């Protein structure tokens, strides 16, 4: 029985082709629709009803648009259109179809005899049903050839009737052969009962060129058209001119095309999908609350199949954190389910439906659960980009901007599809801008592209926004004049174009001067924004007053680049303005997620989240160190959300949105103080107290108070913060053991989850300590005593490298006073020496004089306290623990505190490392590599000392500067785990460098 025969039966179930539907769902996902691949494609298994924490309710028939269907979908005869697979075409028609094309199909080429006017689809391209070409299955396939121009094969209207409120999936196998420019796709359109196409009711698969391979493509048709009666399918081979690439810009363009080649289609299936919806019901799907948001779940299936439905929640790491299995005996269900989530963050909810353990429907939802927004917080330079040219985003824009925790936003008001009617008073776009202005959002207007109509009128490329505004023609005035009139007094920043410019500095300056003159009639003192590639050297002449250079970052940069570009810009700006702060220009930075936000890869997402946070913090830090006001900088996040495909599309936020909110909440209004060094390999930044928003404030009872007043300052956070992360990736976190205040502090991750870290008292001396775990992703420690941390960080040994030679070594202990008052106290050097050993075992091989160092420091004074060190010649090289116990009287009498550092014992003129290996005969071979780091010839003696046999000696004579020598030792009695000491002696000196190597 053919595929066609199997699926024209009235009682068709998904049957053996449910797997095909599953594959089509995944193909539809890859196409960028509202469903996409998940970390676990397994289908819902049957689970006991009591494992589901959610109680579902049936939708009353009278309240639903599908009330026309019987209450029992299994009762009576069911038409084919009510089955899971509505229609299937396998093109196996050789036995009964004498026509050159499949039954029920027609060649939709341009034909004046029909008449059918269809430019680009010449009549000489005729689709056929082919039995000799390789088919995906069987022998039949639909072939669409080209001899120049595009080709179409269209299903006659009335062939497939549908339910108006049901969703459908169209899947096909496609293969192209001999094509270079042309591509293939499947199109589906909805028709009304008269066979007339419904406006806007068209869906397509992606255009593909498979280069001879079979590929599955799929599309989804949403049941949002109440007058839909039929679905019409069109198979297409499209040349570039028909692929939608032109945007109607150049009517005289010469298009490349193929003059030979074919597209083949096979196993075309039209299947009815369950109606699935899942949402938070909140604009932008951002929930700001102390409790997890309830998810609104809708399941409706009209096929009569026994379905199993489940909802699963995944976190940013791809871990399943919550699940609900819906009772499988209901087919029209609605529920509000509140998942038990582990903390604030970004989550992906997956609602899937299966029949006989085969996936037949899936919907996903990306949402954010974040902490409630804090009133009066100044987000500083943090900003976000919102595409108001997308109506769905525009509708949610106020909530999206609020949910990202910022008080600044760049809003896209023009793109190529902008219509003139959307730019007049009372339009949805203008109303949204009004809402943002009234919410006191500091806006930057972005004209990303010229509207198509304007670009066509001027015969220019739509990306040439700046040249058009700088030109003599006033053609832009009807498009931008009303917006400039309306918002010129409230908006200072205006961006013309949204891609990094390639123009020379001279050309740009001329254009910017003309634009500035044109805008002065609308905007007092406009700040004109110029996008600039981050890897392009900054032109000093562009750093002028009333100019903002907006650096466009890309995913290949690291956080180390941020301070470099800020320093480069600052130097140029000062040189151009003779250092006058009131005339300095502005600098912006645009950051984007480095991952594809629609797809699933937990490792990629988390890496992107951490990388973006480090970049943002590094830019904020470098900008703050310039001493300029935050108003001189913009740190913009873009590509922060996406809109799911389809008429029911909703805004899906990226994980970076909640990261941005966390950074804006904690860093906005703060100033950089100092980068400190307490733990090797850990980035440590100390920032000061946070200021409230600069504008006037209103209390909860409605009373007005001015910024800086006692009432306003009473709510300010006077404590500082530390920002910590590992400089390099590590499987294990590093623990900082240090008192950073005299009370509990709070650690916040990038999703603003708070962990309270109590001040512990440890050991017999009851030393205060906070234990702070530090990973690659930044954490923010709040409640920090910044003077105390800076003081402890200033205590260090200089030089911090001990030379491996006999005798007394002269060093100093440095420390400084960050308080505005005089401080005093004592330092005790307790390691090296064993004075921290709980059993009291003192290490006499180290001599340090004096071990007790009293100090008195005036405000901002730095002191060096001299000490002498001596140690045994047998001391092993490498890192050594250096510990200070600190007594301090400053702004308070602090308890005895311990500071732990590391110092290195080595020799500056030598690099040595040793390895051990076992040969096949059991002999242990120790290899020693010695490199001369000085610019003079050196001579060495090597001694290898095993535990159970005689020591061996080797010489290295005349090793030249920069050269390396290798010597080997063989031992017959060494066992696994034995430590072999290798001593390197520089001839005619007291230098002795000792290393140990472990026998494997």
Q: At which residue positions do the language-model features occur?
A:
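Extracellular and organelle-lumenal recognition/adhesion modules and their flexible linkers in secreted
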Residues: 39-342, 352-364, 371-388, 419-420, ...
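Terminal connector regions
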Residues: 343-366, 787-793, 806-809, 872-906, ...
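An active-site-proximal structural segment forming one wall of the substrate-binding cleft
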Residues: 464-496, 507-522, 540-542, 615-617
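Aromatic/acidic polysaccharide-binding cleft in carbohydrate-active enzymes
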Residues: 589-591, 600-685, 689
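Active-site groove signature of glycoside hydrolases
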Residues: 477-507, 534-536, 545-554, 585-593, ...
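C-terminal beta-strand-rich structural cap/linker in extracellular carbohydrate-active enzymes
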Residues: 761-796
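Carbohydrate-binding surface patches
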Residues: 679-743, 823
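Aromatic-lined substrate-binding rim segments of carbohydrate-active enzymes
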Residues: 396-403, 409-464, 505-534, 563-566
């Amino acid at each position: 029985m053919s595929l066609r025969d199997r699926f024209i039966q009235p009682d068709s179930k998904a049957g053996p082709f449910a797997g095909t539907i599953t594959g089509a769902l995944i193909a539809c996902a890859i196409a960028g629709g509202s469903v996409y691949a998940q970390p676990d494609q397994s289908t819902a298994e049957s689970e006991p009803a009591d494992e589901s924490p959610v109680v579902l309710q049936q939708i009353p028939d009278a309240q639903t648009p599908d009330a026309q269907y019987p209450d029992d979908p299994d009762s009576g005869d069911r038409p084919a259109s009510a089955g899971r697979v509505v229609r299937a075409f396998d093109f196996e028609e050789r036995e009964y179809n004498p026509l050159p094309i499949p039954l029920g199909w027609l060649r939709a080429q341009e034909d004046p005899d029909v008449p059918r006017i269809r430019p680009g689809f010449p009549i000489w391209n005729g689709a056929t049903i082919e039995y000799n070409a390789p088919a995906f299955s069987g022998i039949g396939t639909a072939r669409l050839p080209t001899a120049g121009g595009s080709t179409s094969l269209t299903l006659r209207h009335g062939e497939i009737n549908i339910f108006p409120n049901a969703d459908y999936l169209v899947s096909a196998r496609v293969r192209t052969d001999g094509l270079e420019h042309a591509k293939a796709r499947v199109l589906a359109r909805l028709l009304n009962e008269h066979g007339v196409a419904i406006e806007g009711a068209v869906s397509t698969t992606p255009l593909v060129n498979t280069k001879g391979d079979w590929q599955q493509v799929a599309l989804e048709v949403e049941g949002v058209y109440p007058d839909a009666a039929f679905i019409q399918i069109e198979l297409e081979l499209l040349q570039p001119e028909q692929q939608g690439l032109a945007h109607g810009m150049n009517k005289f363009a010469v298009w490349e095309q193929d003059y030979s080649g074919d597209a083949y289609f096979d196993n075309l299936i039209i299947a009815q999908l369950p109606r699935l919806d899942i949402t938070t019901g909140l604009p932008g799907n951002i929930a700001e609350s102390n409790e997890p948001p309830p998810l609104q779940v809708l399941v409706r299936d009209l096929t009569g199949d026994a379905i199993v439905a489940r909802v699963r929640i995944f976190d940013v790491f791809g871990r399943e954190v919550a699940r609900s299995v819906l009772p499988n005996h209901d087919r029209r269900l609605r529920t509000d389910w509140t998942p038990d989530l582990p903390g604030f963050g970004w989550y992906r909810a997956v609602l899937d439906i299966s029949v006989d353990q085969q996936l037949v429907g899936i919907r996903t939802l990306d949402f954010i659960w974040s902490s409630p927004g804090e009133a009066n917080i100044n987000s500083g330079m943090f900003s976000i980009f919102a595409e108001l040219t997308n109506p769905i985003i525009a509708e949610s824009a106020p909530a999206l901007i609020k949910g990202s925790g910022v008080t600044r936003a760049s809003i896209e008001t023009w793109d190529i599809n902008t219509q003139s009617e959307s730019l007049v008073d009372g339009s949805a776009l203008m109303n949204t801008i009004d809402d943002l202005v009234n919410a006191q959002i500091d806006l930057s207007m972005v004209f990303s592209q010229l509207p198509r109509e304007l670009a066509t009128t001027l015969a220019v490329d739509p990306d040439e926004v700046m040249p058009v505004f700088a030109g003599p023609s006033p053609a832009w005035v009807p498009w931008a004049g009303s917006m400039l009139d309306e918002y010129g007094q409230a908006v200072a920043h205006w961006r013309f174009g949204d891609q990094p410019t390639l123009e020379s500095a001279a050309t740009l300056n001329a254009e910017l001067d003309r634009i500035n003159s044109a805008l002065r009639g609308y905007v007092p003192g406009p700040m004109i924004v110029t996008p600039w590639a981050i890897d392009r050297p900054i032109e000093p002449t562009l750093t002028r007053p009333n100019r903002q250079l907006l650096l466009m970052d890309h995913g290949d940069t690291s956080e180390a680049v941020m301070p470099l570009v800020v320093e480069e810009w600052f130097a140029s700006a000062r040189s151009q303005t003779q250092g006058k702060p009131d005339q300095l220009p502005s600098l912006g930075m645009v950051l984007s997620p480095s991952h594809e936000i629609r797809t699933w890869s937990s490792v990629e997402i988390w890496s992107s989240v951490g990388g973006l946070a480090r970049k943002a913090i590094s830019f904020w830090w470098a900008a703050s160190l310039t001493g300029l006001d935050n108003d001189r900088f913009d740190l913009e996040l873009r590509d922060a959300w996406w809109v799911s495909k389809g008429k029911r599309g909703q805004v899906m936020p990226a994980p970076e949105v909640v990261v941005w909110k966390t950074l804006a909440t904690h860093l906005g209004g703060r100033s950089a103080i100092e980068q400190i060094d307490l733990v090797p390999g850990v980035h440590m930044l100390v920032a000061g107290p946070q200021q409230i928003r600069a504008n006037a404030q209103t209390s909860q009872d409605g009373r007005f108070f001015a910024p800086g007043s006692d009432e306003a300052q009473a709510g300010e956070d006077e404590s500082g913060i530390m920002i910590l992360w590992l400089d390099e990736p590590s499987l294990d976190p590093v623990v900082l053991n240090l008192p950073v205040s005299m009370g509990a502090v709070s650690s916040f991750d990038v999703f603003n989850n708070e962990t309270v870290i109590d001040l512990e008292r440890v050991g017999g001396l009851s030393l205060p300590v906070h234990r702070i775990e530090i990973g690659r992703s930044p954490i923010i420690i709040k409640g920090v005593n910044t003077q105390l941390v800076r003081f402890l960080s200033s205590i260090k040994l200089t030089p911090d490298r001990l030379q491996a030679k006999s005798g007394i070594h002269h060093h100093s202990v440095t420390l400084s006073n960050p308080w505005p008052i005089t401080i005093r106290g004592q330092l005790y050097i307790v390691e090296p020496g064993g004075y921290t050993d709980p059993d009291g075992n003192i290490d006499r091989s180290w001599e340090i004089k004096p071990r007790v160092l009293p100090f008195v420091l005036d405000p901002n004074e730095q002191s060096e306290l001299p000490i002498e060190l001596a140690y045994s010649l047998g001391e092993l090289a490498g890192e050594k623990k250096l510990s200070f116990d600190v007594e301090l009287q400053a702004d308070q009498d602090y308890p005895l505190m311990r500071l732990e550092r590391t110092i290195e014992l080595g020799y500056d003129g030598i690099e040595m490392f040793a390895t051990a290996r076992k040969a096949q005969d059991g002999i242990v071979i120790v290899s020693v590599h010695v490199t001369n780091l000085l610019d003079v010839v050196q001579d060495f003696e090597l001694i290898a000392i095993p535990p159970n046999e005689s020591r061996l000696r080797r010489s290295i004579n005349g090793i030249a500067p920069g050269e390396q020598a290798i010597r080997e030792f063989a031992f017959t009695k060494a066992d696994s785990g034995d430590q072999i000491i290798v001593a390197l002696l520089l001839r005619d000196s007291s230098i002795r460098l000792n290393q140990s190597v472990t026998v494997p």
